[in-house]
Amino acid sequence: MAGSGGGVVSGGRQRGPPLFATEKPGRMAMAAYRVSAATVFAGVLLIWLYRATHLPPGGGDGVRRWAWLGMLAAELWFGFYWVLTLSVRWCPVYRRTFKDRLAQSYSEDELPSVDIFVCTADPTAEPPMLVISTVLSVMAYDYLPEKLNIYLSDDAGSVLTFYVLCEASEFAKHWIPFCKKYKVEPRSPAAYFAKVASPPDGCGPKEWFTMKELYKDMTDRVNSVVNSGRIPEVPRCHSRGFSQWNENFTSSDHPSIVQILIDSNKQKAVDIDGNALPTLVYMAREKKPQKQHHFKAGSLNALIRVSSVISNSPIIMNVDCDMYSNNSESIRDALCFFLDEEQGQDIGFVQYPQNFENVVHNDIYGHPINVVNELDHPCLDGWGGMCYYGTGCFHRREALCGRIYSQEYKEDWTRVAGRTEDANELEEMGRSLVTCTYEHNTIWGIEKGVRYGCPLEDVTTGLQIQCRGWRSVYYNPKRKGFLGMTPTSLGQILVLYKRWTEGFLQISLSRYSPFLLGHGKIKLGLQMGYSVCGFWAVNSFPTLYYVTIPSLCFLNGISLFPEKTSPWFIPFAYVMVAAYSCSLAESLQCGDSAVEWWNAQRMWLIRRITSYLLATIDTFRRILGISESGFNLTVKVTDLQALERYKKGMMEFGSFSAMFVILTTVALLNLACMVLGISRVLLQEGPGGLETLFLQAVLCVLIVAINSPVYEALFLRRDKGSLPASVARVSICFVLPLCILSICK
């Protein structure tokens, strides 16, 4: 069956010193961290003890008793989740590669060939110029072009995407030698010309401006074709590939197409300097309206099969179409892990972190990417397995295609597809491998390739690879390997997290649960690491409880925390101060500012009470066979005014959604409770009345402070990104009765 070419089982020889090093933090630093964590855990235990030993009596209406029990349940969960997160962070590791040793140990001819997969699905949502900038960036890797094979999967089967790829194949003849001659970084032409305003060292102004003009001309032609929707006659006459499209073609109903635009085996496939070009292949798998196509997972599996007959490289790298290569040496870095004879035999994939170029300083959405990349993921790596992101990942083909690791197995890095056929025959073979019926009654998507039947197919695929005995590696080089685009509106971000949360929750409730699938196969610490995300959804209810019930009790004068003068006040204060101080220190250590840390805390709260909550509801509705709630936003903010507001630190709302209603309701409720609660205490009891309600008052004030962008969007802003009046009206309908009942009580 297509997909892999087998390996060889034989002894190996160590070629000199190691190709990579694994480093751990200093003992003193880890000891200090663990002592700090131990003191916080002691505080958590004291909080649990206080809740259990000071349970209010059940007299009266029992409101305080029930509220107290709810606080106990929430704090039990927060404590458990904190311990889970802490356990994962117990043994971080950091990787360092030695590319100079790689060059000494392996000649260029001995290095393996690499198949690179780029996936796109919609030319409207993913503009063709964005796609080809990514394609050109990976075509220009600092690697032998004869050993590079780039495959573009176009699930829409769009003739526009094919036309743009044809344009890119011509531009590559100029761009690739320019990049290699002057060591250009990054090698996405769009990113390079946007960032660099002058020629690189050694390049004359005339040559640089000529290259820039070539790129501008291509961009103008592409944009003209995309805007008109019509393909010029010249490319149609000169490329046999265009003849496969007809008026009956749609994105959901079209035959399979495989076109080899550049064949590195042919003498004519050279750049302007006469050097070979990488192989470039366009693929659109067959689509039929009533046939399941499994989205991105199906696309990747189709690429695995097509590549197996054209190139069959032992290394596969896949990248999303909006995440270009920012480091031309990423392949060589990844090979340092795979080709190390002593340490690399069991490495199944090497995962690079996700980084984004459009995140501004003091980002209002507090993207925690630095902390995640610098702290969280190295800790997962320390337990023997970074998860598979779905992009920016180098795979061992054999591991991806289902091979179980054994110590006797040794990879044949020199193997390639045994090509005796010409391009036409290869294309015909490729088309037969990507029909709608090819996978019927096979193990594709079950035991082979990327997994089907789960929302986060990349995560479950990586987990299954690890359960087969393979190890994964996380590598975060100084110069980022890949750069992409992240959403810059609140709605887009919350929908994205809702999708991720649903996926992780469904994995946790299925046979793919790390504790079930990974039992006895991967370390307990790694199982817990996967579960940190798997339990995102569970955080929603305790968090929603904690930001509403204490505030309502404060408004009613019901105390849920110890007095400021009580000894029991100390563990509450210590846990809060110590935990947030540690979080701030970690954020600053990773290069974030204090403002970015504060914004990240806001988004942490917002995600828990919106994305996580609705993801949980939708997941259980699906389990019960009830239709989904339909809370997902579909509006995408792309206009220049919205981008300007983002750069100014203004949250982008702009449309009605259930998520915004929940967020606004919580914000208005706490504002009302703070104002009315403090007024009630001062008028009825004086300043001394706050002694018993001090922590609740602080909590209420903090929630109000963290929701300041919501109040700004409600009361001060009048732009298109502000909160709609309909959101405010619905929220007031929830808040007003609660406040009236409390006041009249």
UniProtKB/Swiss-Prot annotation:
It is an enzyme of class 2 (transferase). Residues 1-14 have a biased composition (Gly residues). Its EC number is 2.4.1.-. It is a multi-pass membrane protein. Keywords: Cell wall biogenesis/degradation, Glycosyltransferase, Golgi apparatus, Membrane, Transferase, Transmembrane, Transmembrane helix. GO terms for molecular function: cellulose synthase (UDP-forming) activity; cellulose synthase activity. Residues 1-20 are annotated as: Disordered. Its main location: Golgi. GO terms for cellular component: Golgi membrane; plasma membrane. It is found in: Golgi apparatus membrane. The chain crosses the membrane at residues 29-49, 66-86, 541-561, 568-588, 658-678, 686-706, 723-743. InterPro entries: Cellulose_synth, Nucleotide-diphossugar_trans. The active site is at 155, 458. One of its GO terms (biological process) is cell wall organization. Belongs to the glycosyltransferase 2 family. Plant cellulose synthase-like E subfamily. Thought to be a Golgi-localized beta-glycan synthase that polymerize the backbones of noncellulosic polysaccharides (hemicelluloses) of plant cell wall. This is Cellulose synthase-like protein E2. It comes from Oryza sativa subsp. japonica (Rice).
